[in-house]
Amino acid sequence: MAKNKGLLIAMAVIVIAVIIYFSTQQSKVSKTGVGGEIKMGIILGFTGPIESLTPAMAASAELAFKEASDSGSLLGGATISPMRADSTCVDSAAATAAAEGLISGGVAAIMGADCSGVTGAIATNVAVPNGVVMISPSATSPGLTTLDDKGIFFRTAPSDARGGQILADITKDRGINSVAITYTNNDYGKGLADVYEAAVKAHGITVSTVTAHEDGKADYSSEAATLASAGGDALAVIGYLDQGGKGVIQASLDAGSFDTFILSDGMIGQSIIDAIGSDLNKSFGSLPGSTGKGAGVFAEVAKTAGIDSSGPYTGESYDAAALIVLACLLYTSPSPRDCL
């Protein structure tokens, strides 16, 4: 109950903050299209190390926008037209260019980005300078908490400052006495690895090594060999399921060095189950989410819309888009052009 209450309070604070920001923008040149159309940006890693996760995330956000449009209640019957862009998850320059394309296209707000590094780059270099509200459903780096965002960047996912502690608690509960840690070499990986390492050590668990890996390589046998030489009851893989993280796991299995893997949120999804199969039977991980009534309602709505909501951050993507819509609904304006 306390967790649910805290979440509701946090969501309310976000809505209020977004509304306050929007209400200061009435004199700005409109960013919406003609004929009651409001353009909204969706920027996620449609290519790259989490490309198997983002289609459902984008579809969930678009579902919220569609519901608002179909209701006829959005600012006198205005409709929302989503515009997609590719963050790549890992290439900040490409992500920034993609976000600039959304701004040029006239979006009023941005749902995204996904991975923490590109999210910070887009917020700092594009969203904040242009005064465009941005809500990420999945950027979890603790560093984003102190981002100089001028009050227009928000998240619907919890920080890894908490996520790393929870993953460490699960590790202890599973009876693991020693771990090797590998992390994707970016803000998300390093931030979560630091929190997780400190938390497992606080539980009395030995950390044999902490090493970074790069995404997009064809071979991870060298990384697997380094981790194998350090040893441990399990290998904690803090990374992405479609590239580096998967590669390290497969190389470790091929070498016979580990058979138990501890997975961060970026490692959880159907594609890695399809790729690795039963060799993951001893493995476990953690994923932010909710088990409350709202989660069940969303799952049913998503299913009806043909969206698989079982993957990470689908609900958070819907929530991020819905928060933008709610801010529009609650902001009294004579024209849809003044909404955002």
Predicted features and spans:
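Short, low-complexity disordered leader/linker segments with a strong preference
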Residues: 1-39, 70
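Hydrophobic alpha-helical segments within soluble ligand-binding/sensing domains
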Residues: 94-95, 155-178, 191, 219-221, ...
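Extracellular/periplasmic periplasmic-binding protein-like sensory domains
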Residues: 251-321, 328-329
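Extracytoplasmic "Venus flytrap"
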Residues: 41-62, 85-92, 114, 182-190, ...
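Conserved small/polar residues in nucleotide/adenosyl-binding loops
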Residues: 331-340
